[in-house]
Structures are given as structure tokens and as C-alpha cells.
């Protein structure tokens, strides 16, 4: 991939045309509308604004993954490199995920947000989540990665299935050598067109953020917080500490600042905050990481895989919420049981990836495996899960972004000049052209 070149001659955008400012204003307006006029906020048409934007983004996720992975692998000289990147990514995911799970346990034990909580459990309210959790099996998860048909994988937007086919297709194209030149050029050109579609769709981000936030506040409202505000605050502060301290230290080891990195991805963070979906920023995130200096093969392999195997925010939530429920129900968990929770959560957090309500399903699976009597206690946190999902999504996005840069650095596939240029100067991505090599 050729070097990024800032469009230095382009005039600076007026502040009201900057995406992150538009999204931020939209979020604030959404909160105001949902709070002051909840009946308007709960309107199906308002909800459709947020849902529609997320669907528009999901529409291009599979093509983005396919083109990025195939183009990246097809230009690699050897298959070993692909395997090496995948192994390093999985090692990183497991280490950092363990840190996230452990942090949730430590904070819950120290602060004890559920101690003295007065609330009611409701087994019926969480019966569906418990049922789905009981049906989760590791072998089913592995088999689910293999699509029944290639068309079905793309049609249903199954990230891991699309990723598997893309890797195989990229390796096959790489093995063709010069005979595959025309197809490589086609995929590269298709990538440009797809990212052009994304540039159009992202312009609707403020509308989507407004609709999603207005509905969330209008539907659940501040009254949904009640005496669970302590748990929400604990989770948000714990996630913030994880990003600033844990990811910050990891970033510093690789030679970049976590604060500059967060500034660089501010547009994506605000889109995720507004939509409560980390997938809503996946295509833009992949494009930005390439501009940051990460090689195309690393971005194509690490980011989509991370959306299933590197869910730092979800991991923190699982252990923190588990202990909160136990404390609220006056159930003591021994040190051994807490270690078991950590080990079980490492498995269940992968088993429900891509499933709607995955955070709650994995929580049910973890509780059922360790102390089944705690499953009805999930009803305590059911009402605030929408507010928690925003923090989970934000933390997951930060974790996957840092993971990609770290794996690229570890593999020697990180362009330091691009990294410094993007972070130190905070180049506006819309003022940068990315050229993809076709040969």
C-alpha cells in the first residue's frame, strides 16, 4: 500500500461540518428529546433512525472484510506470514482478555457495588437468556465458523464465516502468482468502491446517533437507573481505567500514546456511543488503522477476529456483574469459585459472539456454570443493560484498535512514519487519500 498523503492544500472544514462534532451534538439532542419528551423518543420512527444507520453499516461489513483480507493476503509472499499473524493475535487476545476479566473481579471485590442492594429477582424475565446460554456448546461455536454456503455467510453477515472464506480465497489467489493479477486488481478496485460507499453512509451517523440515543433515554429513562447507578458508575470507571492504564501501558510499550490514539478514533467512538454497537464503526476502524500504518493483512485478520475473541468491555462486565448479582443476593463466592468464573468466562465470551444480546447470554452461561441459583438475579441488571452495552461497545472498540496496532508492531508490519504523522498531527481521515497497490 502506498503512503498516505495529506491534502495539505485543502481548506480546513468549518467546525459544524466535522463529523465528531455533528455526532456529539446529535447525541446531546437525543438525550434532551428522550428525557423531556419520552413519548416522542419512544416512537418507532425515532428508533428506526438508529436501527437504520446500524443496518446500513452492517450492509458493507462483509464486503469490507472480504476485500481487505483478500487484498492483504494476496499481496503477501508466503502463507507462513498469515499463520504467524493469526497466532500472535490469538495470544494477545487471551492475555488481554484475562486482564480484563481479572480487573472486573478485583474491582467487584474491593468496591462491592452489590452489598446491601435492595432489589427483586425475576426468573421469568431472564428465562430466554438462560435457555440460550444452556444451548451454547464449544463444538457448535467451532462448527458455526464454517458456513453452509458462501452466499449464506455474506447474506447473513456472519463475520467469522466471511473471514474464513476470505482467508482461504486470499491464500488461493496468492498461490496463483501472476495468473491472479487481474483478480487482485479487481478486488483492490472493489475495496476503493466499497470504502466510497462507507464514506456516503457515515454522513448519516449524526441522524443514527440522535435516533438511537433519543429512543434509549425515552424508552428506559433516568428512572431505570435508580439505585443501580452505583453499578453503572463502577463499570464505566473500571472500563475507563482498563483503557487508560492497561491499554495505555501496552500502547506505551509499542511506542505510542493511548490518549493520542483515542483522539485519532474519536469519530468512531462517538458513533459507537450513539448506536451502542461496536460493529457500527468496524469498516471505518479498519480503514483508519491502515492509515495509521498497520499493514493490510494485519488489519484484515486482527480486527474481524477481535470482534469475537477480544471483547474486553464484555469481559469486564461479565465478572463485575456476576459478583454484583452474588453480592445483591447475599451469596458468598469463594476464591476458588471466582477463579472458576474467570476460566468459564474465557470460554463463554467466545461462544455467543454474533448473537443478539450476547452480553446477557454469556453472563447467563457463566452464572449457570458456577452457581445456577444466581441466574434469576440477572433480572436485577436487565433494566440497565442498554446503558451498560454502550460502555461495553466503546471498550471493545478501543481494545480491538490497540490490538491491531500491537500485532502489527509485533510482526514488524507497522509503519512508524505513518503512525507518528497520524497521531502527532491528528490528520483528518477525510483529508487523506489511501492508494492500494494493484500489483
Swiss-Prot record:
One of its GO terms (biological process) is L-aspartate transmembrane transport. GO terms for cellular component: plasma membrane. Gene3D superfamilies: Sodium:dicarboxylate symporter. It is a multi-pass membrane protein. Pfam families: SDF (PF00375). The chain crosses the membrane at residues 18-38, 56-76, 91-111, 157-177, 193-213, 231-251. It is found in: Cell inner membrane. Keywords: Cell inner membrane, Cell membrane, Membrane, Symport, Transmembrane, Transmembrane helix, Transport. GO terms for molecular function: fumarate transmembrane transporter activity; malate:proton symporter activity; succinate transmembrane transporter activity. InterPro entries: C4_dicarb_transport, Na-dicarboxylate_symporter, Na-dicarboxylate_symporter_CS, Na:dicarbo_symporter_sf. Responsible for the transport of dicarboxylates such as succinate, fumarate, and malate from the periplasm across the membrane. NCBIfam families: PRK01663.1. Belongs to the dicarboxylate/amino acid:cation symporter (DAACS) (TC 2.A.23) family. This is C4-dicarboxylate transport protein 1.
